[in-house]
């Protein structure tokens, strides 16, 4: 397309796209090189960006240079820099250049992979990469596509939990709830430390938050199986229908590891669907020495983990596995006439539209494929081990300082700690650190006490970043206590 023709059509000409694309790659590479110069937590006030934007959209198209100038002037000040090596908040959402390139290619191809027929490579690469991960994480063979189960990429673990809940609901009611709705008797179970998405899933699925039982935890904040069993018995005695339990490998607050094997025994005794949410800590199973966290996963009906947290694959990318794919498909499949095609009717292909809530789906497998091929299992293990090593080093400094204490055992790469002076002091320490822009921490409450969380998992975080963070924490504590 000539420049004149592109101008008449309002499209960007291929030559300009080539030039701007190279500029964008340079900008992203430069951003990563200078990311430490920005305050980690955005310092803007609510409404600041909108006040700087024009009230109406432009009538005439604007130049790419003008857009990028506004990125620097308006957007960057409003960014919290998740890819900063000084980002220690929440759980990581790390990234890598191979993943970014895979995402770019996915956007460039511009496909919609709802059916095998709408892009066979999208479906088959996803199936294959998910099978690779079964081997890489030593997951049960039943989760591979060669057996009765299989894997699919969801957007987040929240969607995986909802899909698991729906499949369990339909298995428990022999598909009646899909036709007639819920009757209020179904009851689901998880721990008090489980992710909030379980409550949202219970609401969406028609189970109701009042029918989601939060089981108490032990001193390490892991679910207590004996309390689960007792609650199930009470619910049955009261005319309820227990049908689903979610165990967690790496709880959001403290990275606690639920005793999956014992929970699975309770689930099987009572005929419940067991879902295992390993959103954060599933990646640890790349390393044989950390596979103790997954003891009992072979007994689960479904499982998920997030490469977009700790496997250098940009958001969003959650890997969801089921032992029996037929149960998932029966719960979610709807086939209108306009989606019928010979490949689907042959029964020889996978249509991932039946494995998720939406119809449409992106080509997420490309970026995951790029990441695995670039790093190899060896490279991924190296970084996981390094992050765990850094976290354990940080935990040792906390133990050695009489002003601080650990709030929970640190099994992997999250350290929960607090100053001994109490909640107000810890809140002030965190607020001062975050306002400084030097690093970013978040908090939780454990044992009803405010607790600081040091989450180590960004792609570029090294020992000197963790050392500096610890020094800054001690400095702020000394300034206020």
Task: Label the predicted regions.
Residues 2-148, 435, 439, 468-473:
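N-terminal entrance/gating region of PLP-dependent enzymes' catalytic architecture
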Residues 115, 133-166, 213-216:
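Short loop-beta-helix segment that forms the pyridoxal 5′-phosphate
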Residues 146-148, 183, 408-413, 445-451:
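Short Gly/Ser/Thr- and Asp/Glu-enriched loop/turn motifs at secondary-structure junctions
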Residues 160-329:
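Conserved PLP-enzyme active-site core in the AAT-like
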Residues 270, 295-402:
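Active-site C-terminal subdomain of aminotransferase-like
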Residues 402-406, 438-443:
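A short linear hydrophobic-aromatic micro-motif
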Residues 405-433:
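Conserved PLP-binding catalytic core of the aspartate aminotransferase-like
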Residues 446-481:
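PLP-dependent enzyme catalytic core of the Aspartate aminotransferase-like
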